[in-house]
């Protein structure tokens, strides 16, 4: 009945939608950034959540301050969700911030990203001084930070993530989330991400 209703409305059937999401999930996971993936959680988790975000995006900061901590605690740390973070710099300032995040010790990457979002309103007013201070606390010296922001290959690699996400996956703004290949609009409602994860876990019988 659902399939007939969907057909009458010109919509894909539930089976088609599930197949499309699975195909997209596979394509997304194969689109590993040239400078390496950054992920948290169990690679064998039943749900993979991919976020495309910009370091200067207020909605991204809101998500990381208000929603992400509970998702991390309730899903990622319990082995239910693999969280993949992909840089989608919407301006040169965001690009520079992400370059610096990639230059800190790898085990400090997510702590750096969290601090960038937490302090977004402050460092965007005086970017170089505040960002250099921030990454300095993560173990990156001022001289290494200076060298980092001149790495053309790193800049090109980060921008390629944005280009591919835009061209192949229809990512237009930030934050954009994919949960097992299903697109969620975190820009309008950050809390919808949690609902999307719950729906996917319920579908898999693992809630």
Stretch-by-stretch model annotation:
Residues 2-89, 202-207:
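Extracytoplasmic thiol/disulfide redox context detector
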Residues 34-35, 118, 179:
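Residue-level signal for pocket-adjacent positions within structured domains
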Residues 53-56, 61-136:
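Structural alpha/beta surface segment adjacent to cysteine/selenocysteine redox centers
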